C-alpha cells in the first residue's frame, strides 16, 4: 500500500548541471559565463540581510501620519484620580478638589490623621466603670479633710496574731488569757525534745548485732 501511494505522487524534478546549461544556453549555443566573485558576494549579502531591514526601508518610503503631541493625547483622556476610584468603590461622591492639585499620598495620610482622635481628647478611663469614678471623686473632694479616724495601728509581731486591744471591763481578763497562752507556748517550746536527744534514746533501745 505504501509503495502504491508513493507512485501516485509526482516526483520532484532533479537539477543536473548538464541539463541546466542546456536549458539556459539552448541547443547549439555557448554556455553563459560563470558569475564573478563580486556577483557571488552580492548574492550572499542579499541573502544574509534580514527581512526587518527591508521592511523598514520600504516603510521609510511611505508618507508618515502627522505627529500628535503627547499632551494632546493626555488631554483627550478623562483624568481619573485616586479619590474618584476610592469613592466609586465605597459608594460615596467625591467632595474634595481634584487630585491634579493635591498629592494622593498627602490626601490619604491627612484623612487617616483626621479620623484618628488625639490622645488628649480620649478619657483616661473607658468602659462602664469610667462613669462610676466621676461621682466618687466629686464626693471625696467635697468631703472636708478632718482628723484621722480613731483606730490604733495594729502591728504584726513574729509569733503573734493581730488582735484589737481589750476594751473597758474585759481588759484584765483578756490580758490574763493572752499572757497565759504566751507562757504556755514558751513552756511547750522549752520542754520539746531536740532531735539529737530523740536519736540517742532510739539508739540506746535498739539491739546490738555483733558480727562473727
Curated annotation (Swiss-Prot):
Ranges annotated as biased composition (Basic and acidic residues): 113-124
The keyword Cytoplasm belongs to this UniProt entry's keyword annotation: yes
Induction section of the entry: By progesterone, testosterone and, to a much lower extent, estrogen. Induced by oxidative stress via FOXO3 activation. Up-regulated by hypoxia (at protein level).
Signal peptide start and end residues: none
Keyword terms, alphabetized: Autophagy, Cytoplasm, Mitochondrion, Peroxisome
Subcellular location: Cytoplasm; Peroxisome; Mitochondrion
Record's GO cellular component terms: cytoplasm; intracellular membrane-bounded organelle; mitochondrion; peroxisome
Any Pfam family matching the protein: DEPP
Known tissue expression: Expressed in various tissues, including pancreas, placenta, ovary, testis and kidney.
Entry keyword Mitochondrion: yes
Coarse class of the protein's main subcellular location: cytoplasm
GO BP terms: autophagy; regulation of autophagy
InterPro entries xrefs: DEPP
Region (Disordered): 20-39, 49-79, 113-176
Transmembrane segments: none
PANTHER family assigned to the protein according to its UniProt record, in alphabetical order: PROTEIN DEPP1 (PTHR15426:SF6)
Job description of the protein: Acts as a critical modulator of FOXO3-induced autophagy via increased cellular ROS.
The protein's name: Protein DEPP1
Species assigned in the record: Homo sapiens
Amino acid at each position: 500500500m505504501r509503495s502504491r501511494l508513493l507512485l501516485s505522487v509526482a516526483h520532484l524534478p532533479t537539477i543536473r548541471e548538464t541539463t541546466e546549461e542546456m536549458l539556459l544556453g539552448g541547443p547549439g549555443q555557448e554556455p553563459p559565463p560563470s558569475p564573478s566573485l563580486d556577483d557571488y558576494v552580492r548574492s550572499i549579502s542579499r541573502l544574509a540581510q534580514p527581512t526587518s531591514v527591508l521592511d523598514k526601508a520600504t516603510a521609510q518610503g511611505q508618507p508618515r501620519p502627522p505627529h500628535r503631541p503627547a499632551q494632546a493625547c493626555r488631554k483627550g483622556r478623562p483624568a481619573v484620580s485616586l479619590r474618584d476610584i476610592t469613592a466609586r468603590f465605597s459608594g460615596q461622591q467625591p467632595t474634595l478638589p481634584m487630585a491634579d492639585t493635591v498629592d494622593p499620598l498627602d490626601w490619604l495620610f491627612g484623612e487617616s490623621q483626621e479620623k484618628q482622635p488625639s490622645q488628649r481628647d480620649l478619657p483616661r478611663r473607658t468602659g462602664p466603670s469610667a462613669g462610676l469614678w466621676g461621682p466618687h471623686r466629686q464626693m471625696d473632694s467635697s468631703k472636708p479633710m478632718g482628723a484621722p479616724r480613731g483606730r490604733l495601728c495594729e502591728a504584726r509581731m513574729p509569733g503573734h496574731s493581730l488582735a484589737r486591744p481589750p476594751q473597758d471591763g474585759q481588759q484584765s481578763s483578756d490580758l490574763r488569757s493572752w499572757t497565759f497562752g504566751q507562757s504556755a507556748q514558751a513552756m511547750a517550746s522549752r520542754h520539746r525534745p531536740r532531735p539529737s536527744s530523740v536519736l540517742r534514746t532510739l539508739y540506746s533501745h535498739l539491739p546490738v548485732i555483733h558480727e562473727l
